[in-house]
């Protein structure tokens, strides 16, 4: 059965996208990005000022059983981690999320309040970062012939590079993946 309002993660996602767009910051928003070794999905990815933001949406109907694991995984890859939730889960999320996680609360009147600013994540994992980037893209930027190395071998070659370079690769990959789609979304939506 389809859920609406604060019981729907999709509805909250739309509200949060509107919230971000209203701020008129130079950013790109991407929907449902598959990341890391475990190939899990993050609800939203935001690219801003050469930084990556993972956004996890928790509606009133969602349970929080996997939240701590999700946060742990996001911290390995993304520069900042944000949780957007409702009043119902506010206290539980404050308890479960460390102080470096940003928290936004969607009120019953559908306004969004920033409860806590995120801090930058410093302990990234090279392999998790590399498994978030498509192997064909790695071939392209590394000038490798596709098929010469399998995906694991290719990622092993890149793992020898410094982590800041790998973070740049991820940002550029995400930018190329989402930029055109986001700009099309903005032009069709009528937001300047």
What positions do the PLM features span?
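Interdomain/boundary linker segments immediately adjacent to catalytic/signaling cores
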Residues: 1-7, 187-192
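Active-site metal-binding core of divalent-cation-utilizing nuclease and nuclease-like domains
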Residues: 4-49
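Positively charged, polar, low-complexity stretches
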Residues: 28, 34-35, 45-46, 101-108, ...
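Structural motif
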Residues: 33, 58-59, 86
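Active-site ExK catalytic segment of metal-dependent nucleases
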Residues: 52-60
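Short, surface-exposed beta-strand-loop junctions and turns on beta-sheet-rich folds
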Residues: 61-62, 120
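Catalytic cores of nucleic-acid endonucleases
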Residues: 62-106
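A conserved mid-domain beta-alpha-beta active-site/ligand-binding segment of alpha/beta enzyme cores
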Residues: 111-178, 182
């Amino acid at each position: 059965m389809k859920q609406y309002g604060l019981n729907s993660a999709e509805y909250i996602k739309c509200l949060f996208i509107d919230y971000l767009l209203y701020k008129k910051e130079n950013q790109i928003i991407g929907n449902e990005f598959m990341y890391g070794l475990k190939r899990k999905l993050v609800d939203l990815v935001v690219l801003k000022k050469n930084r990556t933001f993972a956004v996890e949406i928790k509606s009133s109907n969602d349970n929080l059983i996997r939240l701590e694991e999700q946060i742990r995984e996001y911290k390995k890859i993304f520069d900042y981690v944000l949780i957007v939730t409702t009043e119902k889960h506010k206290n539980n999320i404050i308890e479960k999320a460390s102080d470096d996680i940003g928290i936004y609360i969607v009120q019953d009147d559908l306004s969004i309040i920033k409860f806590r600013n995120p801090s930058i994540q410093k302990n990234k994992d090279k392999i998790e970062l590399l498994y978030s980037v498509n192997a064909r893209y790695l071939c392209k930027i590394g000038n490798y012939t596709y098929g010469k190395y399998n995906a694991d071998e290719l990622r092993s070659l890149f793992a020898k590079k410094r982590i800041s370079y790998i973070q740049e690769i991820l940002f550029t990959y995400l930018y190329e993946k989402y930029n055109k789609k986001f700009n099309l979304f903005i032009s069709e939506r009528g937001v300047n």
